[in-house]
Amino acid sequence: MNKTGNEKSTFTLAYFSTLLDGYNLTVSAPLIVILSRFMNLSLLDTALLASSALIGNAVGGFLMGRLPDRFSRKTLLIVDLLLYAVMGLFSSLSITIAQIIIFRMLLGIGIGGDYPNSSSLLAEIQGNTGRGKSVGFLGTSWTIGFGLSLLVGLLLYPLGPDAWRILLFLPVISSVVIIILRSHLNESTPWKKSREVAKRDNVRRIFSKELRVFTIYVTTFWFFFDAIHYGISEYAPLVMKTIGLHGNTTGIIASLILASVEVIGTLVGISLVDREGRRKVQIIGFLGISVSMLVAAFVTQEYVLIFVLFALGEFVGFGPGILEFIYPPEMFPTELRGTGAGFANSMSGVGAVIGVLIQPFILGLSNGVTYLFLMYAGMAFAVLMLTIAIAPETSSKAVITEMPEIQ
């Protein structure tokens, strides 16, 4: 399918906004490391700093995911970015830890709306051929944003006590540019055709008998995947210290390498996801995560463990790292697409928050690292079994534009 200039711009801006999503959702890891140099952060401070944007993401996915179905894909794409540009600015100007937490929580609400809206819009524009690759590249963009947050944090670490302000302010500039460019985009044609239908109670409809299995699957896999992924990415410095690797920036460096491996994994995944199918890629991804976490639980040599974690990154990117963007918009019709993807993103945010909040307490236990990796292995294995049992294959199907009346 040959894209028009407007469609190419839509894809490009979606990729860049998702890159900013990845940056903003994972910047807490270097933020905590930098703040710890100059402040005595409590365990509660650390947990709330790590989870604040994720909490907002969970709320935003539910509240703002529904709005594009009712009002406008284009308008909400601008509102989402405007919200987290403003809150990103306020975060960088904060004078207390509490203010950083509150503003980043509000920033997360904007991210929660951008996630489902961007993937829904791209799925509606892209034809059946190559849809997985085009939409899946959002996963690559997100992971690049993850890596950039770590790289910027690493570069800013040697600077003075205000380095964290620069870390939080940099995405604001890019957000403003994307907002201006998005204002010139066209509205989604499938959405314009379905807008009257979308005025119904969409949350209830995604649990109708026609869509219930899709909703259960996509929310469950995304919930557990984000619990694992954010639990590891947000606390990599703490994990590295616990397994015996010290140094103020060791965790950031390890996470940066992990993010680089994930990028490679996403590129491999999107090269196969249309040809081999969604189910096969997802199964391989969660199988790899399960095995990696199980091996990590019983490895005692620090550097072997790091190698295992890098293998984990490859499988994370290969499977769920791209399918969290591909699957949701393919499972719901146009009038429910933002609602369904938004609800799934909201539940993934809940999983991410749980993963982030419980990890410091587990690591504080004797043999805490072993328990942590065993827990993650169990989560991944449960999703693997669920995928084998009920995950649909959507690669050869056109995106659903409408469906029969749902009671």
Tell me what each language-model feature is:
Residues 130-153, 174, 345-355:
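Glycine-rich segments within core transmembrane alpha-helices of 12-TM secondary carriers
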Residues 83, 87, 98-106, 305-312:
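Paired small-residue
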Residues 103-140:
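Cytoplasmic helix-loop-helix junction between adjacent transmembrane helices
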Residues 165-180, 372-389:
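Symmetry-related core transmembrane helices of the 12-TM Major Facilitator Superfamily/SLC fold
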Residues 28-29, 210-266:
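Extracytoplasmic gate region of multi-pass secondary transporters
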Residues 59-97:
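Conserved MFS/SLC helix-loop-helix module at the cytosolic interface between two early adjacent transmembrane helices
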Residues 9-43, 229-237:
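Extracytoplasmic
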Residues 40, 72, 93-99, 127, ...:
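Helix-breaking motifs and short loop linkers at transmembrane-helix boundaries and internal kinks
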